[in-house]
Amino acid sequence: MKFRTATLHDAPAIARVHVASWDVAYRGIMPDDVIAHTTIAWRTGWWSAELARHEWPVFVLEAPGRTGEILGFCHVTASRDPDADPQTVGEIPSLHVLPHLRGQGRGRMLLDRALAELQHRGYAECTLWVLAENRPARGFYEKLGWRPDGGRMLYGGTDVPEVRYRIGVSPQPVTAPQGLVKGIDSTVDREPDRV
């Protein structure tokens, strides 16, 4: 497997992972009409615009071999929360892995890569938002040391509550041991400008 920074060319592949992950992780939590609106075409457009900005990286994990299939991705940025200092607090807006590959350590590896990026840029903390009812995701983050910090909001345009998690960005990010770690890979996504 290989990590790399996504390019604009990767938008369709990232969109496919994103939609597949949403369909499995959020079904029964997110309203059906929101999930139905989350199409590959819509996500491709969204990711094309995001990747074109070149402000912050989206890290992708590629399958070994010549195919270069994207297995998962993690987006990292400065915090977008009004109560956070975007100079010292980073954010993970999206972490997604193909559903059939969860529990094999890929999500953790992507998350570690994103935290390493924040550490490299001198950030002290990182936050992310998790749907309150997404117990597998919450367990995944808590197992890795993330803790709820009291931040709560509704997912853009819905009545679905989200909980904010926070972790310090250590000088040496936790890394997955050699091979893959058994655990729960999860999904998190927050796009307040979503229709």
Predicted features along the sequence, with ranges:
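Glycine-rich phosphate-binding loop
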Residues: G105
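Short acidic/polar active-site loop segments enriched in Thr and Asp
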Residues: A124, R147
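Acetyl-CoA-dependent GNAT
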Residues: T5-H9, V19-H100, R108-R113, E117, ...
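Conserved active-site tyrosine of GNAT-family acetyltransferases
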Residues: Y141, W146
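Conserved beta-strand-loop-alpha-helix junction that forms the acyl-donor binding cleft
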Residues: R102, L128-A137, L154-V160
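Extreme N-terminal starter segment of soluble prokaryotic enzymes
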Residues: M1-F3
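Short hydrophobic/aromatic beta-strand or adjacent loop that forms the aromatic wall/cage
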Residues: W56, V160-R164
